[in-house]
Swiss-Prot record:
UniProtKB keywords: Antimicrobial, Disulfide bond, Fungicide, Plant defense, Secreted, Signal
The keyword Transmembrane helix appears for this protein: no
Entry GO terms, CC: extracellular region
Domain of life of the native organism: Eukaryota
Protein name: Putative defensin-like protein 73
Native source species: Arabidopsis thaliana
SS bond partners: C33-C68, C37-C57, C43-C66, C47-C67
Family label: Belongs to the DEFL family.
Subcellular location: Secreted
GO biological process terms held by the UniProt record: defense response to fungus; killing of cells of another organism
Encoding gene per record: LCR44
The keyword Kinase appears for this protein: no
Signal peptide interval: 1-29
Length: 70
């Protein structure tokens, strides 16, 4: 019985470590687009208010999406 408890504890701890390794790479904030630049008066200020370091309008032909980055 004691051996079963130790084995189950080992499995739980191993699962937690593996889960942490998978999740830790995704914790860093990725660039996020928050809306169109037409709707936001100042893209950079809107991003800073949301906790990002800066923001800029991006797009292929016309920069019309406000995207924030850390």
């Amino acid at each position: 019985m004691n051996c079963k408890i130790e084995f189950m504890s080992f499995l739980v701890m191993t699962s937690i470590v593996i889960l942490f390794l998978f999740v830790s790479g995704k914790v860093e904030a990725e660039p996020q687009c928050i809306g169109s630049c037409e709707m936001l008066a100042d893209c950079n200020t809107a991003c800073i208010r949301m906790g990002y370091l800066f923001g800029q309008c991006v797009g292929w032909k016309t920069p019309d999406m406000c995207c924030c980055n850390h």
